[in-house]
């Protein structure tokens, strides 16, 4: 199984929040991914990088918040998250590095 550099470009970071931790009980892992990443690309990257079988991938786009910085208005960038459901018997420990 070969790992290409493109797999590292798809997944940005794991999301470690209370909600994501609760989802891990149901074999789900949440990752921050690039905006242009598609579901098949995310599935392939997770399977190659973590050596697991992916059951499904759900994505969502979080719109950036409007912010005021030193009196000028701006907005944070939009971000994309992927909720990856793993097959039974497979686990990913996101607290360890790649």
Curated annotation (Swiss-Prot):
The keyword RNA-binding applies. GO terms for molecular function: rRNA binding; structural constituent of ribosome. Keywords: Ribonucleoprotein, Ribosomal protein, RNA-binding, rRNA-binding. The keyword rRNA-binding applies. InterPro entries: Nucleotide-bd_a/b_plait_sf (IPR012677), Ribosomal_uL23-like (IPR013025), Ribosomal_uL23/eL15/eS24_sf (IPR012678), Ribosomal_uL23_CS (IPR001014). Coiled coil: none annotated. It holds the Pfam family Ribosomal_L23. GO terms for biological process: translation. One of its GO terms (cellular component) is ribonucleoprotein complex. One of the early assembly proteins it binds 23S rRNA. One of the proteins that surrounds the polypeptide exit tunnel on the outside of the ribosome. Forms the main docking site for trigger factor binding to the ribosome. Belongs to the universal ribosomal protein uL23 family. HAMAP family: Ribosomal_uL23_B (MF_01369_B). Part of the 50S ribosomal subunit. Contacts protein L29, and trigger factor when it is bound to the ribosome. This is Large ribosomal subunit protein uL23. It comes from Nitrobacter hamburgensis (strain DSM 10229 / NCIMB 13809 / X14).
């Amino acid at each position: 199984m070969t790992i290409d550099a493109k797999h590292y470009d798809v997944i940005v970071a794991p999301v470690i929040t209370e909600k994501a931790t609760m989802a891990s009980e149901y074999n789900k892992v949440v990752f921050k991914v690039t905006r242009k990443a598609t579901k098949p690309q995310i599935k392939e990257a997770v399977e190659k990088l973590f050596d697991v079988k992916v059951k499904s991938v759900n994505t969502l786009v979080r719109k950036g918040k409007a912010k005021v910085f030193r009196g000028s208005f701006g907005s944070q960038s939009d971000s994309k998250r992927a909720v990856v459901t793993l097959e039974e018997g497979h686990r990913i420990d996101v607290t360890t590095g790649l």
